[in-house]
Amino acid sequence: MLKTRLIPCLDVADGRVVKGVNFVGLRDAGDPVEAARAYDAAGADEICFLDIHATHENRGTMFDMVRRTAEQCFVPLTVGGGVRTKDDVRALLLAGADKVSFNSAAVANPDVIAEAADQFGSQCIVCAIDAKSVAPGKWEIFTHGGRRETGIDAVEFARLVTAKGAGEILLTSMDRDGTKSGFNLEMTRAISDAVNVPVIASGGVGTLDHLVDGVTKGGASAVLAASIFHFGEYTVQEAKEHMIANGIPMRLQ
């Protein structure tokens, strides 16, 4: 049976790890390379590294930080933020990323997913979907850090990008992000059921039970969290042990 993955997320702005509430009011949570190294040592299954200002401020992802992180971390590293072209994917893979995540660029041009997947393989192409609830059972994609509405249905878009070749969906509930009220389980389940690739649930973890719910109720293949780990509320080990106690297969060190 495939093990469920636990993924700490390092949101980076101006070279530092930050964790905001609903992408506003950022708090400094440390140096990204140090944080990644600590999570590697703590038993994280993967690390997700997102430059949250790259798209908004229209600058490329910080390749040097990726390179330094990859040199010191030996778990898979997913990198996103400001990724626009297959050349960006190539540069990040060369810098040491294992997977590269498209977000706003894929919404503007879903074919960029196909171009990147054709060249590098679906296994290293992630599509990040940031969505908000707009009506019962309906979720809409927002881009540029949640600042721009698109009118695009999140479930339909997930089907489209996986058909184009995305090997994984990183699904963030913008309504829940930073609130510690738990994942949007209905949305997570709807998208998990709609696609045949792994879905990473993101946005809203406040307790260890929320991680369990993402898998058992949301159908996610992996769960992502930031602030509960960054500020020492729980360790990766505690989270994994709690998930195992609830019948979820996890990798322990």
Swiss-Prot record:
It holds the Pfam family His_biosynth. It is found in: Cytoplasm. The active site is at D11, D130. Its EC number is 4.3.2.10. CDD domains: HisF. InterPro entries: Aldolase_TIM, His_biosynth, HisF, IGPS_HisA/HisF, RibuloseP-bd_barrel. Heterodimer of HisH and HisF. IGPS catalyzes the conversion of PRFAR and glutamine to IGP, AICAR and glutamate. The HisF subunit catalyzes the cyclization activity that produces IGP and AICAR from PRFAR using the ammonia provided by the HisH subunit. This is Imidazole glycerol phosphate synthase subunit HisF. The gene is hisF.
